[in-house]
């Protein structure tokens, strides 16, 4: 999803992720009317099916890198031994093993974003919503993340990304441009 600032891109992601309510219309998630779900059902969907990569990271300052990555697995009820293995895999994948015991304030912005991405994908969601996932990364890291997202998509995860970067948008299969809350164009890549 692309468009100028204020076009409604992040709002659309929040509606798709069931964090915000639409003003009108219907939205179905896994054949369920998302616009009519109660908070308990929305929470269940978040835990089991949706991963979020936020532009502003939303890491928990009082938790280490490893604990931040582990948090969604605790909510999903994953056993401790399995959680540790899954966190270790993410730390290794993102070259952050040496930083596992650091707190977010001790990391650069790019490193914080990598932790946010690892946290979003550690539970292997069916839908990954990414709001400017490469916004605070240098270009090589950005390309690495885009290749990873592409691989996850090939493995069956649906990914909806908001970006201002044309090159990174082309990693997707479809580009939707939004202006003033309306779809301006919808192109297959």
Feature map (PLM): residue ranges:
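ABC family nucleotide-binding domain
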Residues: 1-172
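Short amphipathic beta-strand/extended segments with alternating polar/hydrophobic composition
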Residues: 36, 188-189
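H-loop (His-switch) and adjacent beta-strand-loop-beta switch element
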Residues: 175-188
């Amino acid at each position: 999803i692309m468009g100028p600032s204020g076009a409604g891109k992040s709002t659309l992601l929040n509606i798709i992720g069931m964090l915000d309510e639409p003003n009108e219309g219907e939205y179905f998630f896994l054949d369920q009317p998302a616009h009519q779900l109660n908070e308990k059902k929305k929470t269940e969907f978040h835990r089991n099916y949706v991963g979020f990569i936020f532009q502003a990271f939303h890491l928990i300052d009082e938790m280490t890198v490893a604990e931040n990555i582990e948090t969604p697995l605790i909510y999903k009820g994953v056993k401790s031994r399995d959680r540790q293995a899954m966190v270790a895999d993410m730390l290794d994948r993102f070259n952050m093993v040496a930083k596992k015991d650091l707190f977010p304030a001790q990391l650069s912005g790019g490193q914080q974003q990598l932790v946010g991405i690892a946290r979003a994908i550690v539970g292997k969601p069916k839908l990954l919503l990414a709001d400017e996932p490469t916004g605070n990364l240098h270009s090589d890291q950005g390309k690495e993340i885009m290749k990873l997202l592409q691989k996850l998509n090939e493995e069956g995860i649906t990914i909806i990304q908001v970006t201002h970067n044309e090159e990174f948008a082309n990693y997707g299969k479809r580009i939707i441009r939004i202006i003033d809350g309306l779809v301006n164009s919808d192109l297959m890549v």
